[in-house]
């Protein structure tokens, strides 16, 4: 949040630095307190316990990445959830709705990344667009937290800060809505058909290259 505050000041030169510095000091104190809580032995033990349990669970999971039907089923569900959330994202949406959209976009981004090396140029571009979208929504989330810190402070300087936050969040959310409409334009079934065609094209090229690869020296004729 401290970095977001500095970025906000950089974009809004008319904000008084004296008021901003007082807010920055409060944020640094809160951040330090949070770090101390995370560093406490009980917190570390809990993190290690959860991480260990998750690792044990993942080691039991074996997914055949060549099983397109299995991958397609998961991708379709992830895409459908994201499409529904972004289509419902309206101007002035509540923080929870924006956060759920960000989570859905990240799920799709990671899922598409798992398709490498078969990912086409278009899929890679989609991943980059999703990355920018999640960055925008991540900044919006940080600004929402910053705004909640300022909410109970009533002097003029903090009021100006909150107005600047509101303007920036409106811009970020507007950009996210437009990006979401483009990225989730297709219906889920059409989107999976689109991915399947690209996957099939990649498989044809891959198999041809494998057939044309020179045999290793000493291999049986």
Over which residues does each language-model region extend?
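Function-determining surface determinants
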Residues: 1-221
């Amino acid at each position: 949040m401290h970095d977001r505050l500095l970025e906000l000041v950089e974009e809004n030169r008319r904000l008084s630095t004296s008021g901003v510095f007082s807010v920055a000091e409060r944020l640094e104190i809160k951040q330090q307190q949070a770090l101390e809580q995370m560093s406490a032995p009980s917190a570390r033990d809990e993190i290690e316990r959860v991480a260990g349990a998750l690792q044990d669970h993942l080691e039991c999971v074996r997914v055949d990445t060549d099983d397109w039907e299995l991958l397609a089923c998961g991708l379709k569900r992830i895409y459908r959830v994201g499409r529904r959330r972004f289509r419902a994202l309206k101007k002035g949406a509540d923080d929870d709705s924006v956060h759920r959209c960000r989570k859905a976009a990240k799920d799709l981004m990671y899922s598409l990344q798992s398709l490498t090396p078969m990912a086409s140029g278009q899929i890679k571009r989609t991943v980059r667009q999703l990355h920018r979208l999640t960055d925008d929504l991540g900044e919006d989330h940080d600004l929402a937290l910053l705004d909640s810190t300022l909410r109970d402070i009533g002097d003029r300087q903090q009021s100006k800060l909150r107005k600047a936050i509101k303007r920036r969040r409106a811009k970020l959310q507007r950009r996210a809505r437009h990006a979401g409409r483009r990225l989730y334009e297709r219906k889920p079934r059409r989107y999976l058909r689109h991915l399947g065609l690209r996957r099939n094209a990649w498989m044809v090229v891959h198999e041809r290259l494998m057939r044309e690869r020179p045999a290793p020296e000493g291999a049986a004729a």
